[in-house]
Amino acid sequence: MSESLEAEVKTNPQGDPITSMEPEQKTNPQGDPITSVAAPKTGEVKKDPHAEAKKQRIVTPEYMFFEAPRTKEFITGSEAAKEAVRRSNVDLSIAYPITPQSETMQLIGVLYGEGYVKEYYRGEEEYGVMSAIAGASRAGVRCFTATAGPGTLRGLEPIVSWPGHRLPALAMFTCRVVNAPLAIQPDNIEISYLLNCGMILFHGENQQDLFDFIMKGFIISEKNDVTLPVGVACDGFFVTHARGYVHMQEKGIKLPPREAWRGAVPVLDAENPPARLSRDAPVQKSNFMAYNIHAVWQQEVWAAVERSRKYINQYMGGLVTAENVEGADAILIASGSAVAQSREAIRLCKDKGIQVGLIKIRSLRPFPIPELRQLCAKAKLIVVPEFNYVAWLAKDVAAAI
């Protein structure tokens, strides 16, 4: 029996014969035909994305803060935080997004891609982020992270352990509403949870404060007689998303690296860890400790907070600033974005012939008790505006004076 030797006829998916053998048409993932393919360039040198970061030179904090030329830029608070970190020689940053902080940590990721931050990753949630920051800081690296509102409360347990462990990490708190009715507008009630944990705490009014406080916070936190975490708080959206003028140093300089061996407590040797991290010390049995032993440690933490005053005065120019206090009929005492709104209230009062002074509080911990007592000695009326229901600032002011 004879067999047909005809060539097999190829058909398309519909069964029609393919009459021409043209090359198969390539398409992109959307199914559109690709009409041309660029040939790879020969001899092309790949650009190093870290080239600019590698050119940064280390300068002293004194030069960075007081001598380096500055240029004025119109940027958001998130961008100001990014530029501060760029110049701060940060070893590690860990992110977990939450509004209004998300943009800040996204921009820190850009810095990582450019080589200005050595290590960067996303944590699983805020508790994990703050715990990982604790471990990294204990190992001796300079750490930066940020959170906001509910994220602050979720990460609060590890955060409040930082001071007792004497960890000089820096966290930015972009304050927002934490309780119902939930909103993302500024409400800084979360600061009340941070005031008495032993952390040094600054409250920035605007984008310039955010830029300056972050860089200076690293240096203050790592001083040998301090060795404490620093929190830099700002009011979300009013600062993080709004734009303002910021005077910045050039990108080509950075702060000296952290010298962990200078700290008040030894760092953990990650290469040769102890066989048991939680050995029973002479002052405790398992997790039992007499309260007076715990209290002595807390007293030293708060003594270190007080010792930071001289460095705040040295690098930040004081815990407070005062405007038109002498001879004023009333004095407004505020921190954060309430300072900017207080200035507008003072302007309106001046139009009506009422002289009102302003005290801007930069440092919440340590709190400026002697400064307030001196500035308010002759005050007839004191008003404390703030964005929270518990009035944590008003209570501190009342206790101070």
Regions from the PLM with identified roles:
Residues 109-111, 160-163, 188, 218-220, ...:
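Short, solvent-exposed amphipathic alpha-helical segments in soluble enzyme
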Residues 208-214, 218-244:
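Conserved anion/nucleotide-ligand pocket segment
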Residues 155, 181, 241-243, 341-343:
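Short helix/loop capping segments that flank catalytic or ligand/cofactor-binding pockets
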Residues 229-321:
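Conformationally flexible catalytic loops at phosphate/diphosphate-handling active centers
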Residues 99-100, 150-151, 176-177, 206-208, ...:
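Short, glycine-/Ser/Thr-/acidic-enriched flexible segments
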Residues 2-9, 16, 21, 32-199, 307-401, ...:
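Thiamine diphosphate
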Residues 145, 171, 231-232, 332, ...:
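Structural beta-sheet core signal
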